[in-house]
């Protein structure tokens, strides 16, 4: 059983650390929080400042909870939610591979699936969940991580995502060269 606990610890530290770094970059990287807010606005998630702050706090908090192994399925659900929003609002239209122009959905999909797996796996014996006697492993943990995350993302997208309309092609008479 130690192999499962080792896997849970490695996944929690890797995923939690990555999500913390992502949230930290929202707040303190390049354009800082105002730059993140402008980026949210540019992909149609409005108001940008509210969502930049919300995403930053969610990623920092969920990442810390994962590292500690505290409320693991709920922390995983928070990560699933933020990644599903990123997938739908920005990455899906760019194809699968992250190296493609516009960055495809490969990265956010993997973070989402690892989060779901960690929800199913639970925090493991070396977690604060274990110390507190909190455990929701298996299908129940997976359901919490996946369904709460997807549900939260769907709610956010339904209420706050307003992408710019796609440009319609010019009528044939306007695009054809004059004779």
Regions found by a protein language model. Name each.
Residues 68-70:
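Alpha-helix C-terminal capping segments
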């Amino acid at each position: 059983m130690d192999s499962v606990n080792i896997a849970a610890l490695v996944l929690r530290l890797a995923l939690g650390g990555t999500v913390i770094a992502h949230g930290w970059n929202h707040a303190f990287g390049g354009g800082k929080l105002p730059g993140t807010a402008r980026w949210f606005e540019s992909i149609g998630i409005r108001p940008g400042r509210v969502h930049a702050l919300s995403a930053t706090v969610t990623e920092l908090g969920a990442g810390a909870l994962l590292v500690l192994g505290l409320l693991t399925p709920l922390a995983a659900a928070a990560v699933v939610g933020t990644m599903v929003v990123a997938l739908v609002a920005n990455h899906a239209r760019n194809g699968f591979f992250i190296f493609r122009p516009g960055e495809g959905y490969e990265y956010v999909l993997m973070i989402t699936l690892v989060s779901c797996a960690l929800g199913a796996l639970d925090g493991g014996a070396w977690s604060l969940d274990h110390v507190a006697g909190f455990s929701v492993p298996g299908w129940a943990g997976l359901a919490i991580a996946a369904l709460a995350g997807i549900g939260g993302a769907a709610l956010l997208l339904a209420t706050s995502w307003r992408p710019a309309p796609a440009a319609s092609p010019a009528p044939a008479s306007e695009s054809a060269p004059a004779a």
